[in-house]
Amino acid sequence: MIATPDDYSWFSPERFPGLADAYCFTYVRGLTPEEVVTRLGVRVEDCSRVTLDGLIRRQTFGAVAVGDWVLLVEASSGLGITEEIITPLSAGTRLVSHFYLDVDGMDYFYWIDDGKIRFEYAYQEGYSHWIKDGKIQFMFRHHESYSEELPDELAEILERIDSPVYPIADPHEGPAFLLAERLTGITMTPRLLEESTYLCGVVPGSR
């Protein structure tokens, strides 16, 4: 059963200080943490294994395997929404990411398949696709980085986001988690974040 927006109220600054108000979660399918780190230009031998607290203190990224996916967790960083990074990182596979920065009220969401953007939420622009007249429609100006395929598999989630029960909320308030779950099959939980050990590194030139 897919979660509802209210199911993510646990992800709060009170429980996750230093993360919930400035985070980026990125999911990459079919790779290992070591392969993801290598694609990011980081030498595996320069990485270390850390807990979530250690990752937050370092304000860097950490990678952990979750089933067939790798989850990248970032504190106060936005590699997962930098198109110059995530477009090549998605080569031959699927990448899903979402980002929030509380101080600016800034939300972003990406779904990329093999270098082509399938769906996006952009700060101050909104969703790239929405349901109008019962159909998924493209809302942004088209450019070559976008896939021509419509993200029909998201129709149910978009309808729920815009339902009378769950009125439209900012992505970080639940919709981004719902969309990521639909696209990856992974439900974000406190246990997943708190009990994982992360392969932690620094991307060259990111600081």
What are these regions (language model features)?
Residues 4-5, 10, 119-121, 125-207:
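Long, compositionally biased intrinsically disordered terminal regions
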Residues 30-39, 81-83:
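Short, conserved charged micro-motifs
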Residues 1-32:
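Short, extreme N-terminal leader segments that mark the start of a protein/domain
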Residues 18, 48, 97, 188-191:
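Residue-level signal for secondary-structure boundary elements
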Residues 48-123:
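Short, intrinsically disordered low-complexity segments
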Residues 35-43, 88-89:
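Short amphipathic alpha-helices in soluble, non-transmembrane regions
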